[in-house]
Amino acid sequence: MPKVGMEPIRRQQLIKATMAAIDEVGLAEATVMRIARHAGVSAGIISHYFGGKDGLLEATMRQILTDLSDAVAARRHALEDDSPRAHIGAIIEGNFDRTQVTGPAAKTWLAFWASSMHKPVLQRLQYVNDRRLYANLCHQFQRVMPKADARNAARGLAAMIDGLWLRGALTPEGLDAAEARYLAHTYLDQLLTHYGCYQDASTADFK
């Protein structure tokens, strides 16, 4: 009989094992048996908790997305400056949080992006994540520029964040998070300057 309270622990253990297996051999070769070996459990446990490999991959991506949301929220909550530029900066920082850029997390993200083109459940997760990033950026940009400009700025910065992340994740040495953050912040400042609202966006009590 399983111990009371073991399920959350076991689920986290299997999610970490999934990321480790994908990091080691890629998604296609990350079999249920290999994941189970990484976790030190029987393969039947995966079916018991997740219904199989697809369910486990979905749970793994939900965990990474939760980590991303938490990283952004923590940075925004800690802000002493309520300016749009500060909030957008926190969003940038959260997207390059260590939970998103380690080898296992990065390779799991890449596997997720590829699989989402063919698996509706993963495609929905990807859509929700994309919309959340765009909506959060757009809301802050709209505080200092017209709606049409804010939408364009949000699309541009979201693409910049995704592009920096993707290029970094595909390099043999891995993603340089510090460089990616610097480039994204630089692009943000260029956007604000282009739309003529750098000063307003940097001030919490602008009119």
From Swiss-Prot:
Key words, A-Z: DNA-binding, Repressor, Transcription, Transcription regulation
Annotated coiled-coil segments of the chain: none
Record's protein name: HTH-type transcriptional regulator BetI 2
UniProt-listed InterPro entries: BetI_C (IPR039538), DNA-bd_HTH_TetR-type_CS (IPR023772), Homeodomain-like_sf (IPR009057), HTH-type_TetR-like_transc_reg (IPR050109), HTH_TetR (IPR001647), Tet_transcr_reg_TetR-rel_C_sf (IPR036271), Tscrpt_rep_BetI (IPR017757)
Function comment: Repressor involved in the biosynthesis of the osmoprotectant glycine betaine. It represses transcription of the choline transporter BetT and the genes of BetAB involved in the synthesis of glycine betaine.
DNA-binding region boundaries: 31-50
Encoding gene, per UniProt annotation: betI2
GO BP, one annotated term: glycine betaine biosynthetic process from choline
